[in-house]
């Protein structure tokens, strides 16, 4: 436990990016060594900026001790990236989380046929039923289902997995002591009992809109494959799909009606060849049967007729959740820079304030080299500050504050 407080301290240094934390760990070896280093030693780390060195001068462990106390009371486990049971699949992604909080029993992910299921929070009855049925089939056939416990397709995926008596893992964008959405209290309990809830955010961290695109890299990173159940053209589920592709993982999508707005994202993934078309769980699992013959239990399974009966009720809840999300559009204060943005990122955000722009326009307006613009956009898309739309136009997903 003594060593864990340094992991918590490093993970909670305000304004320090995940990339910077990884650079420090790579240089110093352990967070304890990072803690006891001085400013001269920090300057030796390539990629660490003077502003970040000043942040590391704050050596109080009071917040870390408070978080560890909360974890003890809540029965949470802390998993660091240097622990032997930290999943290798996750360790190998771009910018893995340094620290994870875990409630429940996390299976040995590297030995499992873990499949992520994502989709819109405003899922239609069609999407809800598809999510439940596919998740049910996956778990009955020996897979582990990973999702985000959000309203809509996520919740339906977890329900299907639980109905099958299988293991399911929820990756949250908030602390494990906070239920979001509130009506998923029972779902949280059932997931923790049969699998695990995990988060890179400590107890007490509220659900913020920009947390969710960041946590998506964990959902796909833990998984062999990602299934997009239902997604419109600008769905966060498509960010997860793109992240999965960048991680070298397989992507599948459930096709929908050609005139259904909620299926346009899935249909586009399939049409572009970015995702394989599936209609049931076996369409996914047969890809891994030869590699995991001891895990995959058979071909198709018989589905209970009652699967999907909650679809319309879930749709109503999803609409309410979506409305609440719009009302709580996150803000980003550029003056205080609590998010730890680089100068390049701040310049790009300010340039996008007047409207969406393509990369070439951003390079011209900011006079920042191409490589740095692309790097900054990638990081900000992962953090949920910008999104890429049609025609490769980038736009803001936050409200900028300058006060």
Regions found by a protein language model. Give the residues of each.
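Glycine-biased, small-residue-rich flexible motifs in mid-sequence functional cores and linkers
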Residues: 1-4, 80-403
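Short, small/acidic-rich helices and loops at N termini and domain boundaries
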Residues: 1-84, 269, 385, 391-392, ...
């Amino acid at each position: 436990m003594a060593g864990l407080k340094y992991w918590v301290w490093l993970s909670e240094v305000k304004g320090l990016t995940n990339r910077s934390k990884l650079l420090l760990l790579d240089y110093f070896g352990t967070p304890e060594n990072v803690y006891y280093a001085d400013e001269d030693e920090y300057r030796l780390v390539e990629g660490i900026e003077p502003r970040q060195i000043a942040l590391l001068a704050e050596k109080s462990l009071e917040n870390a001790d408070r978080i560890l106390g909360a974890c003890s009371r809540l029965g949470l486990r802390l998993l660091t990236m240097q622990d032997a049971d930290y999943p290798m699949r996750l360790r190998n992604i771009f910018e893995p989380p340094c620290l994870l909080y875990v409630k429940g029993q996390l299976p040995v992910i590297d030995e499992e046929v873990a499949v992520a299921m994502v989709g819109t929070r405003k899922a239609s009855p069609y999407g809800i039923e598809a999510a439940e049925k596919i998740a049910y089939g996956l778990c009955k056939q020996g897979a582990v289902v990973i999702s985000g416990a959000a309203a809509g397709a996520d919740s339906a995926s977890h329900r299907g997995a639980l109905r099958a008596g299988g293991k399911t893992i929820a990756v949250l964008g908030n602390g494990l002591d906070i239920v979001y959405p509130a009506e998923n209290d029972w779902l949280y309990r059932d997931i923790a009992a049969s699998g695990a809830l995990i988060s890179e955010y400590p107890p007490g961290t509220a659900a913020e809109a920009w947390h969710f695109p960041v946590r998506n890299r964990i959902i796909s990173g833990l998984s062999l494959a990602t299934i997009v159940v239902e997604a419109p053209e600008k769905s966060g589920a498509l960010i997860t799909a793109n992240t999965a592709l960048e991680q070298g993982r397989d992507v599948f999508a459930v096709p929908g009606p050609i005139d259904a707005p909620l299926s346009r994202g899935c249909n586009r993934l399939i049409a572009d060849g970015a995702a394989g078309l599936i209609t049931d769980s076996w369409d996914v699992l047969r890809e891994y049967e030869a590699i995991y013959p001891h895990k995959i239990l058979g071909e198709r399974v018989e589905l209970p007729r009652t699967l999907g009966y909650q679809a319309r009720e879930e749709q109503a809840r999803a609409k309410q959740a979506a409305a609440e999300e719009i009302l709580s559009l996150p803000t980003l204060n550029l003056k205080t820079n609590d998010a730890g943005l680089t100068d390049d990122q701040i310049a790009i955000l300010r340039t996008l304030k007047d409207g969406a722009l393509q990369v070439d326009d951003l390079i011209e307006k900011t006079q920042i080299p191409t490589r740095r613009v692309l790097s900054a956009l990638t990081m900000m898309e992962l953090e949920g500050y910008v999104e890429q739309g049609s025609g490769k136009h980038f736009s803001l997903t936050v409200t900028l504050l300058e006060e």
